[in-house]
Amino acid sequence: MIKAIIGKIIGTRNDRWIKQYKKKVLAINTLEPTYEKMSDTELQNAFEELKKRVRSVEKDLQEKTLLEVLPESFAITREASKRVLNMCHFDVQLIGGMVLNDGKIAEMKTGEGKTLVATLAVALNAMKGESVYVVTVNDYLAHRDSKEMEPLYHFLGYSVGTITASVRDDDERLEIYSKDIVYGTNNEFGFDYLRDNMKYSLEHKVQKSHAFAIVDEVDSILIDEARTPLIISGPVNRRMENYNKADEVAKSMQVEVDFTIDEKNRAILITEEGIKKAENLFGVDNLYKIENATLSHHLDQALKANYLFFIDKDYIVANNEVVIVDEFTGRLSEGRRFSEGLHQALEAKEGVSIKEESQTLADITFQNYFRMFSKLSGMTGTAQTEATEFLEIYNLEVVSIPTNLAIKRKDLNDLIYKSEKEKFDAVILKIKELHDKGQPVLVGTASIEKSETLHALLKKERIPHTVLNAKQHTKEAEIIKDAGLKGAVTIATNMAGRGVDIKLTDEIKELGGLYIIGTERHESRRIDNQLRGRSGRQGDPGVSQFYLSLEDNLLRIFGSDRIKGVMEKLGLKDGEHIESKLVTRAVENAQKKVENLHFESRKHLLEYDDVANEQRKSVYKFRDELLDVNYDISVKIAENREYALNQIFSKLKAFDNQNLSKEELLGLKNILKEDFNTNIELENLEQADSIENFVAEKLKNDYENKMKALDSEQRSRIERIVYLQILDNAWREHLYTMDNLKTGINLRGYNQKDPLVEYKKESYNLFLELIEDIKVEAIKTFSKIQFENEQDSSDAERYLDNFSEEREHESVTYRHEEALDEDLNAAIKVFSKTPKRNEPCPCGSGKKYKDCCAKSGPKKGLFAK
């Protein structure tokens, strides 16, 4: 109350920002007559002078210089836009551009021209000479926006590229990223970052810097998709029959007898009766013994798949595959899979082909990817409801930009019915009334299942209509564009079609504009506001209203008791509804509860990912050092050798150079032979003044002699590549261990321990082990590298050039996989893990290992003895 009164007196924080920006708008507008008089060449030259001014100062002063040249830059960009695009930036769009340049989120209503607004901040920040990324939610918008704005950028002397999933060639991607301005989707940018950190050459890395990014539909990308990490992964061998068996067991279990469902937290709890039944059906005496951990995990996922996830709501089945439906957009999430075996459980449930589970090779959340940028900003029509999260997680403030024209849309109170049937009957009557009148209507549903229900009812009433859900996603833009035609009836799942304007003719405006009907409140108020926002663009008339029932998930789970009590007191008959601000407020309170749950969930995910992120940054930084041709890796190898030997000597009891028994010396001799491929006579160890110094010098000399066959450049490249391979393999195993740690860490809570604190402690210890393992494994591998003296440089080059990077769509969340050349991969594995005597020899001879390289070592190649 007090806050509201103060706000009215001195204005809100948002009001004060807008007031400051309006002063700068005046400065920009005063420059307009000057630039209008210039020829195209003069205008372009003026812009080039601004670029030179920005690039001439030190990097840490460039941001300050951008603010100084902002009025001129914005004025020139606006004038260029008028000439090239025949579009003029309104004053409110200039404000939006300044908000973006300040690293904030510009909340701009639908139809206010966000695509054009972005050009102001993009053109200004590209002056620094580093690529500016414009991030969109799908390939269609990335391609459309870049092509529409490209003539303007070209006029200003900038190059433009677009990264989409269809760009498969690495050289082409490298070329696109070299452009001044790059448009693309959040997935493509994120995956390219991960792929960059699997490359074996700095020149092949596509993302050279993370200077400035503008995220369109920022709420969708940074909020809705924040819980879905990007993962590059490889297959893990699991027995496929376990999924089917777990599915059979799950389907035989009864709700409230064998398990209970917690809908609020989307969890399933197995009862004692359920555990006994499962043990009997699996044929085990204790489901939770360590050897049965896989079975219990499969059962948990099978229960979730059968009782918490529903076809045509959470996923669809198409082409013998289970395809996820994005809960926020209603779009199909092609290539994305549920993790931890849930997707396989769904495949078993639906009787389609079961694909392998996978091991994480590289991963990152959108939260940590976008927080890498020196400056980040965003645009959306709906951000204020999530302003706290944007500020806490991303340090992004939200500024609501005034509309160019006043909003004329009428947002009516919700209508609430007792049952879903009564609600849909009322919706059909309203649609029929509007259709007969000729007024277009857009109907929003919460799932494919509900859109199909409405489709059947409209078909029965013979009302022509179009359905837009995940099954028709390829026609999305065309369907949404036509939603404003006379008599059009369009059913859309959630807010599929974001980014596409629904334009109205004068005739439609006379009829009252686009009528929005929401058939269910979403868990997030923001999604509801997006649906409303499809109507009333740029001062157009329009109406929005939600039709709800007590059987809707939101009201049933979170908030219907109070509303149900009101309806019972009123004694409403079948088909009657209640409509009041009190009820609408109760619904919004229920939504706030859910929003808070989701916020805490995303925050919780980030707290865990922050732990891994610090480790990821350390590993990737070291990786870049190894890729640098100027990095002296010989120093690192010498350090590793010293460390590995210290580890060995520290384990020898009572070690003080000469107090080792003959047995201990023999043990040391065997270790040096087995781990480092170094032969030292026992008598030499016995006679050495300092065993430690003697062994260290021997290992060093042996290694130097082995590497004489190579020139310095070849040696450096091979050492770096082999070290990178060791690092990558160790990092992948570390990620696998971290995944397992995270999976079971919440159980620590039962022991009165904070799972997050425990996770931080154990992951830190695991990281220390990772560093130690890399050092020891590196020196073991390097000690076994050998070139035959007669081997020429072309042979070495052949091995070096055999590194190929292949991208494949795999079977986990947004998965792509990259593979190294099998020959070198296998060669490294030969000596990092010695084969058993009766296993096939890895050299490819076809003989058993004991009859081949176990005797004499590999006959050829990098690792020949």
UniProtKB/Swiss-Prot annotation:
EC number: 7.4.2.8
Sample GO molecular function, one term: ATP binding
Cofactors: Zn(2+)
Keyword Nucleotide-binding in annotation: yes
GO biological process, one term: protein import
Pfam families: P-loop_SecA (PF21090), SEC-C (PF02810), SecA_DEAD (PF07517), SecA_PP_bind (PF01043), SecA_SW (PF07516)
Binding site for Zn(2+): C841, C843, C852, C853
Keyword Oxidoreductase: no
Localization of this protein: Cell inner membrane; Cytoplasm
GO CC annotation, single: cell envelope Sec protein transport complex
Principal subcellular localisation of the protein: membrane
UniProt KW keywords: ATP-binding, Cell inner membrane, Cell membrane, Cytoplasm, Membrane, Metal-binding, Nucleotide-binding, Protein transport, Translocase, Translocation, Transport, Zinc
Positions with a binding annotation for ATP: Q93, G111, E112, G113, K114, T115, D501
Top-level taxonomic group: Bacteria
UniProt topology in membrane: Peripheral membrane protein
Cofactor: binding details: May bind 1 zinc ion per subunit.
Catalysed conversion reaction: ATP + H2O + cellular proteinSide 1 = ADP + phosphate + cellular proteinSide 2
Stated role: Part of the Sec protein translocase complex. Interacts with the SecYEG preprotein conducting channel. Has a central role in coupling the hydrolysis of ATP to the transfer of proteins into and across the cell membrane, serving as an ATP-driven molecular motor driving the stepwise translocation of polypeptide chains across the membrane.
Similarity comment text for this entry: Belongs to the SecA family.
Complex formation: Monomer and homodimer. Part of the essential Sec protein translocation apparatus which comprises SecA, SecYEG and auxiliary proteins SecDF-YajC and YidC.
Record's protein name: Protein translocase subunit SecA
Gene: secA
